[in-house]
Each structure stands twice: as structure tokens, then as C-alpha cells.
């Protein structure tokens, strides 16, 4: 796992020979982190990488004493249901109504 600090947040990424994932974390207040550009390449799906990304996000949130994770995803995509399965709730439609803001409150 490599970690890179950027001007706007932190980037975590992992490279395998044929695929990779990246997770961008932004924290602009003391109680919420925002995930952006969470990606697992198509051929890597079904191998638990998405679960690992969410574990990393939750670990990083807890490390910062943050209790809420928010993200935005395409509402018509399978990934919307996948996030719900992993404890995220619909929060509100984005200005562009194709996207839904979602949140997960950590224990």
C-alpha cells in the first residue's frame, strides 16, 4: 500500500501486476471524510478489493476520530446498491440528479 499526501487530501493506492485501486480521502471538517474516485478495475472485481478499500477508509476515519464517511455515486449503477449493502444510506440527490450523496455513520 502506498500513501501520498496531496494538497486536497490523501491518496491511497495499491498496484498489482494487472490491476490497481485508488482511494482519495478529503476531510474539510472534524466529523466527516469524503471519498472520491474509488475505483477497482473491471477484471479485478469480485476479489474483495472494494471491501478492502472501505476497510481502509473506515480505518483512516477512525484514526482521525471522524464518525461519518460520505461519497457520491451514480444512482443508476450497481455500485449504489453495493454501497447500501456495506452500510451506506442515501443522503440526498446531487444537483445533477444522476448522482446520490450517501453516508455511513461509524460505530
Task: Indicate where each model-derived feature is located.
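Conserved GNAT acetyl-CoA-binding A-motif
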Residues: 61-74
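Acetyl-CoA-dependent GNAT
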Residues: 1-36, 41, 93-97
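Conserved acetyl-CoA-binding loop-helix of GNAT-fold acetyltransferases
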Residues: 40, 46-59, 85
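Residue-level detector of conserved, well-ordered beta-strand and adjacent loop positions
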Residues: 36, 72, 103
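Active-site/acyl-donor-binding loops of N-acyltransferases
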Residues: 93-107
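Short coil/turn motifs at secondary-structure junctions
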Residues: 28, 43, 76-78
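Conserved acetyl-CoA-binding loop of GNAT-fold acetyltransferases
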Residues: 84-93
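Conserved beta-strand-loop-alpha-helix junction that forms the acyl-donor binding cleft
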Residues: 71-80, 95-99
Amino acid at each position: 500500500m502506498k500513501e501520498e499526501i496531496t494538497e486536497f487530501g490523501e491518496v491511497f493506492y495499491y498496484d498489482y501486476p494487472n490491476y490497481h485501486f485508488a482511494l482519495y480521502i478529503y476531510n474539510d471538517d472534524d466529523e466527516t471524510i469524503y471519498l472520491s474516485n474509488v475505483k477497482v478495475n473491471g477484471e479485478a472485481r469480485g476479489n474483495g478489493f472494494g471491501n478492502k478499500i472501505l476497510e481502509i477508509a473506515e480505518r483512516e476515519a477512525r484514526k482521525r476520530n471522524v464518525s461519518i464517511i460520505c461519497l457520491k455515486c451514480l444512482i443508476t449503477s450497481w455500485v449504489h446498491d453495493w454501497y447500501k449493502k456495506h452500510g451506506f444510506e442515501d443522503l440526498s440527490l446531487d444537483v445533477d440528479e444522476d448522482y446520490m450523496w450517501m453516508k455511513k455513520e461509524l460505530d
